[in-house]
Amino acid sequence: MRGAQRSRLSIAISVAIVSVAAVVLFHLLRGIDVGKVIAALEAEPRWRILVSAALVVAGYSNLVGYDLFALHSIGKRDIPLRVVAFTSFTSYTIGHSLGAATLTCGLVRFRVYSFWRMNLLDIAKIALFTGMTYWLGNIAVLGAAAIYAPQAFTAIDQMPAFFNRLIGFAGILAIVCYLLWLGGGRRVVGRDNWRIQLPGLRGTMLQIAIGVLDRVLASLSIYMLLPPNPEVGCTMVLVVFVIATLLGIVSHAPGSLGVVEAAFLVGLPQYPREDLVAALVIFRIIDFFIPLMLAILLFAARELRLLTRRSSIRRLDAQVDASFTP
């Protein structure tokens, strides 16, 4: 398939997912009692919101692991931790909020890491390793969850439990085969200037752990906001959350808005719609809007500081030149 065809197919898939999500949201939210949503918001225990916020902070802190692992994998180990933390937070938050995350995350990373003698090829390699970490974590989580609780997938894929369990075994088997392949010796992929050495067995296990922890922390943060329900456990929320975010990424919708909400409303019919909407509203505030505002402020402050520094240097150069002018 040629590049133009792939691009058109990608756009078509994105439009289809967003369109389906919009139709689903319209259908599920039609007739919803806004008063009950407000009442559910007011009734949400404050301690649950605080625990959810703490899990969100832990999840964003875990993002540093993505960039640190990628930087170590490409031999860039001299970047200060504060720079890595700043870059991972701002690139992920701004990139995934604007949509087209691969491009926007890369632009933010290049803007920061270019000051540390990194070129576009280095940024592409970082994107590859962070993407691998993310997908390995997702496959591991979904595979294990499908084996342990295959019924958690049923509301979304409408498949019988045994079929979902088979998919889970296939996912775990794929990871095991990948690990065995890596354990067979040094693995290098690519050609010419685009050649990278894949992490070894231990490194890949760490990579999977980073990705899994990311998914678990994020799903727990929304699970804490849901009212207690004996029919819904952590595993079910984890499954719905991972599938929802994957659909959001494929859709390229800014912040996956609408897509994630539609997936939750479909995947968790055990909850009253008003209670679920209230939980999603709170989750969006603490996991999306607040981090986005903070990331924009931090990035803008950095750019303003750099601009001020350049202006000061230009003024100093002008003064020096003037002092030597007869």
Where are each of the predicted segments found?
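Re-entrant/interfacial helical elements at transmembrane boundaries that shape
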Residues: 102-115, 144, 254-269
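Mid-bilayer segments of alpha-helical transmembrane spans in multi-pass integral membrane proteins
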Residues: 92-101, 131-143
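Membrane-interface alpha-helices at helix entry/exit sites of multi-pass transporters
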Residues: 82-86, 101-104, 115-132, 272-282
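Internal, well-ordered alpha-helical segments in soluble enzyme and binding-protein domains
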Residues: 109, 119, 125-135, 139, ...
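Residues at alpha-helix boundaries and short interhelical turns
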Residues: 78, 97-98, 117, 216, ...
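Transmembrane alpha-helix interface/packing and boundary motifs in multi-pass membrane proteins
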Residues: 90-99, 240-261
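Short amphipathic alpha-helical coupling elements at transmembrane boundaries
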Residues: 39-43, 72, 108-115, 125, ...
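Predominantly cytoplasmic-facing regulatory/coupling regions of multi-pass membrane proteins
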Residues: 1-89, 138, 147-249, 271-280, ...
